[in-house]
Amino acid sequence: MSSFIQNQFEQNFITTNVDHVFNWARKSALWPLTFGLACCAIEMIASSTSRFDIARFGAEVFRPSPRQSDLMIVAGTVTLKMAPVLKRIWDQMPDPKWCISMGACSSVGGPFNTYAVLQGVDKIVPVDVYVTGCPPRPENLFYALLKLQDKIDTMTTLVKRPTEVRLDETMLEEFKQQIRIAQIQNPA
């Protein structure tokens, strides 16, 4: 009788751990936030059209609200005036959350090495995957989504990852100085 029950158990139940189930659900249903700032946003929008179909990768609907999103795709040039807004939106997103930096401008400032442009979004939010190109093709964004899904698949549920970038005092003062200069030269 006990061997019969044992065989029934093995045939009808799947044993797994919680991390595998949670990570499968997280990577299969990413909810990206629309945060397009420049040219890369056009390619990000094109990725959701029928020709490219981002829904195949589990990132079907771009959300307009940070409280409904778990993936921020920063696509375009981040200016110093936009940086606090981006940080506030990042803070409003629920955990776990991820960030993809799409394009040269959001990754390293692009060709704009000026006082008004943030030289990399990773100075204010932690970036999980960088997408190269100016602007990158939708296929590059899909590759980044696959890399992010691989990263999510290896996460543990109980260990929290850092969701904040800590700036040392000199970087913080330099950042504030750049904001002051931008505000003086461009009063709003």
Curated annotation (Swiss-Prot):
Broad class of where this protein is predominantly found: membrane
Subcellular location: Cell inner membrane
Top EC class of this enzyme: translocase
UniProtKB keywords: 4Fe-4S, Cell inner membrane, Cell membrane, Iron, Iron-sulfur, Membrane, Metal-binding, NAD, Quinone, Translocase, Transport, Ubiquinone
Residues given in the record as [4Fe-4S] cluster binding sites: 39-40, 105, 134
One GO MF term attached to the UniProt entry: iron ion binding
Enzyme Commission no: 7.1.1.-
Protein family (similarity comment): Belongs to the complex I 20 kDa subunit family.
NCBIfam families: nuoB_fam, PRK06411.1
Role played: NDH-1 shuttles electrons from NADH, via FMN and iron-sulfur (Fe-S) centers, to quinones in the respiratory chain. The immediate electron acceptor for the enzyme in this species is believed to be ubiquinone. Couples the redox reaction to proton translocation (for every two electrons transferred, four hydrogen ions are translocated across the cytoplasmic membrane), and thus conserves the redox energy in a proton gradient.
Record-given protein name: NADH-quinone oxidoreductase subunit B 1
